[in-house]
């Protein structure tokens, strides 16, 4: 498992990021989007319009 920072843009234009542990970039992005859709991040948007993950 590696530590990734996931950068996302919501449907409201908010830029949010999350730090997650995952085994790949695609898994990290999936975890980040799930967190966003589940309301776990401090933002008003819940739909991810753009997403990218980088190793921390």
Predicted regions and their residues:
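A detector of low-complexity, intrinsically disordered, Ser/Thr/Gly/Pro/Ala-rich segments
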Residues: 7-8, 23, 32
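A short, exposed loop/beta-hairpin motif centered on an aromatic-Gly-Thr core
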Residues: 14-24
């Amino acid at each position: 498992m590696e530590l990734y920072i996931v950068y996302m843009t919501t449907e409201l234009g908010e830029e949010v990021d999350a730090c997650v542990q995952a085994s790949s970039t695609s898994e990290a992005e999936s975890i980040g989007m799930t967190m966003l859709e589940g309301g776990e991040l401090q933002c008003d948007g819940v739909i991810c319009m753009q997403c990218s993950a980088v190793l921390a």
